[in-house]
């Protein structure tokens, strides 16, 4: 996995975690 893809996945994961915490 290339670093840019990894950064994007980390960003998506953070957003998903925020959604779960809000729920």
UniProtKB/Swiss-Prot annotation:
Keyword tags: ATP-binding, Iron, Iron-sulfur, Metal-binding, Molybdenum, Nitrogen fixation, Nucleotide-binding, Oxidoreductase
Tell me a GO biological process for this protein.
nitrogen fixation
Catalytic reaction(s) noted: N2 + 8 reduced [2Fe-2S]-[ferredoxin] + 16 ATP + 16 H2O = H2 + 8 oxidized [2Fe-2S]-[ferredoxin] + 2 NH4(+) + 16 ADP + 16 phosphate + 6 H(+)
- How and how many cofactors are bound, per the record note? Binds 1 [8Fe-7S] cluster per heterodimer. Binds 1 [7Fe-Mo-9S-C-homocitryl] cluster per subunit.
Q: What class of enzyme is it?
A: oxidoreductase
User: Which GO terms label this protein's molecular function in UniProt?
Assistant: ATP binding; iron-sulfur cluster binding; metal ion binding; nitrogenase activity
- Reading the lineage from the top rank, the first entry is Bacteria
The coenzyme or cofactor needed here is:
[8Fe-7S] cluster; [7Fe-Mo-9S-C-homocitryl] cluster
Q: Where is the composition biased (Basic and acidic residues)?
A: 12-23
Q: What is its EC number?
A: 1.18.6.1
Segments for region (Disordered): 1-23
Return the similarity comment: Belongs to the NifD/NifK/NifE/NifN family.
Free-text function comment from the UniProt entry: This molybdenum-iron protein is part of the nitrogenase complex that catalyzes the key enzymatic reactions in nitrogen fixation.
Query: Subunit notes for this chain?
Result: Tetramer of two alpha and two beta chains. Forms complex with the iron protein (nitrogenase component 2).
Q: What is this protein called?
A: Nitrogenase molybdenum-iron protein alpha chain
Q: Which organism is it from?
A: Anabaena sp. (strain L31)
